[in-house]
Amino acid sequence: MDPCDCAKTGACNCGATCKCTNCQCKTCKKSCCPCCPSGCSKCASGCVCKDNSCGSSCCQ
């Protein structure tokens, strides 16, 4: 089950506390967004959320 409605609302809930906005993706992972808002670093795994924002070093 998809934990977010980013395809509908444009917001991804990543993990328990982080929320990515302006998403264009259709699915979300539990700890990563496969889409990143402008200003977030991007990589193959998406953007890793740290605290309440998207981490700048996301590749793991």
Curated annotation (Swiss-Prot):
UniProt-annotated binding residues for a divalent metal cation 6: C36, C40, C43, C59
Binding positions for a divalent metal cation 1 per the UniProt entry: C4, C6, C20, C23
Ligand binding (a divalent metal cation 7): C49, C54, C58, C59
Annotated region described as Beta, given as residue ranges: 1-28
UniProt entry keywords in alphabetical sequence: Metal-binding, Metal-thiolate cluster
Binding site for a divalent metal cation 3: C14, C18, C23, C28
Residues given in the record as a divalent metal cation 4 binding sites: C32, C33, C43, C47
S-S pairs: none
Gene3D superfamilies: Metallothionein Isoform II (4.10.10.10)
Binding site for a divalent metal cation 5: C33, C35, C36, C49
Region feature (Alpha): 29-60
Metal-binding is among the record's keywords: yes
InterPro entries assigned: Metalthion_dom_sf, Metalthion_dom_sf_vert, Metalthion_vert, Metalthion_vert_metal_BS
Binding of a divalent metal cation 2, residues: C6, C12, C14, C25
Pfam families: Metallothio (PF00131)
Family: Belongs to the metallothionein superfamily. Type 1 family.
Listed name of the protein: Metallothionein B
Protein's organism: Carassius cuvieri (Japanese white crucian carp)
Gene: mtb
